[in-house]
Regions:
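N-terminal secretory signal peptides
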Residues: 10-12
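HDAC/HDAC-like amidohydrolase catalytic core signature
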Residues: 6, 15-340
Length: 340
């Protein structure tokens, strides 16, 4: 197994810089504990038809249950979110798009799931409502992060949803909505999005285009969906076969530069696991260790700068994806502890 250029041992040194850096900024250091956000109602159940879709919708449930089984959290620790309201949805999306989600064929197109034509169920209830809840989970995780430092939504990261349409399995732009709500509440002014899903977050870019209060940083594979790519604030295109060493070196170099020049009040991570070797929809060659290191690097960079951070799960289409994301979340809990 190739050793990631930035190791977990090296990242441990970041914590010692926290108090010094926070005091230099005139802000009290945050506690940086982990708050998990989850509801069993995130799970989409279509009587087995959901298994025909490449996305493992049960990965949220699998990760949560494994955290419980291994004693990393308790049921009492998990924060259960509220679903996004209509007004919150309209902070980013248009009214015509909201109405379009009531039309079966539109949902089938947005989710790229023709098998849903066979589902004898109300798709708005069985799909839109769980996604509305898990999107509310991103807002809940962000609010928690502002209090305890690290909010992890075991869902979310729907980075292909655009103001007027859905695509790429995504129908609600959860991160842009969370940013707009926090800004409306005067909780934040500026937000950084670090998108390390293998696919460019084209929807996020469209939602936040020409917005000086946000910065979109995406590292993604060059020759896969979406084509053509959108133009974000910083886009790093990677070729198929990219491995741990190269990936984390590029990430570290660019992340340090961005965080020095863009003063964010909160950071959102689109933590897709489709960079894992063997993912059927991509061609990068990262290992579980490399992805755990990747996520730890981003969070440690936020801790070093005393910036609250929100983690969302986004994509990951191999049978091992949930296990890798579990290892990453477990490592963050082991490193920072859970919020009390």
């Amino acid at each position: 197994m190739r050793q990631a250029s930035v190791t977990l041992a090296m990242l441990a040194g970041f914590d010692s810089l926290l108090v010094q850096d926070a005091l230099a900024q005139g802000k009290p250091p945050m506690p940086f504990r982990v708050q998990i956000v989850y509801s069993p109602l995130y799970v989409i159940d279509l009587g087995g038809l959901e298994k025909l879709h490449p996305f493992d919708i049960r990965k949220y449930e699998k990760i949560y249950k494994q955290l419980l089984l291994d004693g990393k959290i308790s049921d009492q620790h998990a924060l259960v979110p509220e679903p996004l309201t209509r007004d919150q949805f309209l902070l980013i999306h248009t009214e015509p798009y909201l109405q379009s989600l009531k039309v079966r064929e539109n949902l089938i197109r947005y989710l790229e799931a023709p098998a849903l034509r066979l589902a004898p169920v109300d798709l708005e209830k069985k799909i839109v409502e769980p996604v509305r809840l898990s999107s509310g989970g991103t807002l809940s995780a962000a609010r928690a992060a502002l209090e305890v430092g690290i909010g992890i939504n075991l869902g979310g990261g729907y980075h292909h949803a655009k103001p007027e349409s859905g695509e790429g399995f995504c129908i609600i732009a959860d991160i842009p909505i969370a940013i707009r709500q926090l800004q409306a509440d005067n909780r934040i002014k500026r937000a950084l999005i670090v998108d390390v899903d293998v696919h460019q977050g084209n929807g996020t870019i469209c939602c936040l285009r020409d917005d000086e209060s946000t910065f979109t940083f995406s590292m993604h594979q060059d020759s896969i969906y979406p084509i053509p790519k959108e133009i974000g604030d910083l886009d790093i295109e990677l070729q198929a076969g990219c491995m741990d060493d190269e990936y984390n070196r590029i990430l570290e170099e660019n992340l340090r530069r961005i965080m020095s020049s863009f003063q964010a009040d909160i950071v959102f991570i689109v933590g897709g696991c489709d960079t894992l070797s063997g993912d059927p929809l991509a061609g990068l060659e990262m290992t579980t260790e490399g992805i755990v290191t990747r996520d730890a690097l981003i969070v440690a960079s936020c801790v070093e700068k005393n910036i609250p951070v929100v983690f969302t799960l986004a994509g990951g289409y191999s049978s091992e994806a949930w296990k890798t994301q579990y290892q990453s979340i477990r490592h963050l809990i082991d490193t920072y502890g859970v919020a009390k």
